[in-house]
Design a protein with these regions (language model features):
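Short, surface-exposed basic-aromatic patches at helix termini and helix-loop junctions that form
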Residues: 53-54, 116-119, 141-143, 165-168
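Structural motif
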Residues: 36-42, 64-67, 103-107, 128, ...
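Extended catalytic core of nucleotide-activated donor transferases of GT-like folds
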Residues: 69-142
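A nucleotide-sugar donor-handling region in carbohydrate enzymes
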Residues: 7-19, 142-177
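Hydrophobic/aromatic residues located in beta-strands of well-ordered beta-sheets
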Residues: 60-61, 124, 149, 173
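A generic structural signal for alpha->beta connector loops
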Residues: 58, 77-79, 121, 146, ...
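N-terminal pre-catalytic "stem/leader" segment of glycosyltransferase-like enzymes
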Residues: 1-97
Length: 177
């Protein structure tokens, strides 16, 4: 009984903390040009070079994560928003104002929290972190809601062509070295 009560109190504490983090973000931070979504600390190495290349530009950048340990991984002087609850993370995704959202997470609009924003001007870019095929290695519709997908081999290139054809999409393919 005490364990259950402690668990409930911990969840309530997380909700309250996320509420104030999100409120602070809304009041003080405003819109961003690019938002990098780091699902957890393990995805940072795949986005690190892209983030560093974007720092020198005069555009506002935000790093968003659900992993509270991400701050220890990142030594860059960038704003970091951490929302640990799915509830506030979903609200963040639905209301974000940015030109680009860059992520290594698939299943945009088909997962529990990773949703497209109500702001139709935001472009979603998927950064590849695996050499596996896009059709056999992921869920069937894992990429159909992205605007651009990084391709790192010829198999992924062919898979992306097939996905575009099957779902009548025009998802851009690009290579990043």
């Amino acid at each position: 009984m005490i364990t259950m009560i402690m668990s409930i109190l911990k969840k309530i504490n997380l909700l309250i903390r996320d509420f104030f983090r999100y409120l602070y973000f809304l009041i003080n931070k405003g819109g961003f040009y690019k938002i990098f979504f780091l699902e957890n600390e393990n995805t940072y190495p795949y986005l690190a070079e892209i983030i560093k290349r974007n720092i020198s530009r005069k555009k506002r950048i935000l790093i968003f994560s659900q992993d509270k340990n991400i701050k220890m991984k990142i030594s860059l002087n960038l704003p970091i928003l951490i929302l640990e609850t799915n509830f506030f993370s979903e609200i963040f995704f639905l209301t974000l104002k940015a030109k680009y959202l860059i992520s290594t997470t698939t299943d945009l609009d088909t997962s529990t929290i990773f949703k497209k924003t109500l702001n139709k001007k935001c472009r979603y870019i998927y950064i590849q972190h695996s050499h596996i095929g896009l059709i056999n290695g992921y869920r069937e519709k894992a990429f159909i809601n992205f605007d651009a997908v990084q391709i790192i081999n010829k198999y992924q290139y062919e898979d992306m062509k097939e996905i575009n054809k099957k779902y009548f999409k025009k998802i851009k393919r690009f290579k990043f070295n």
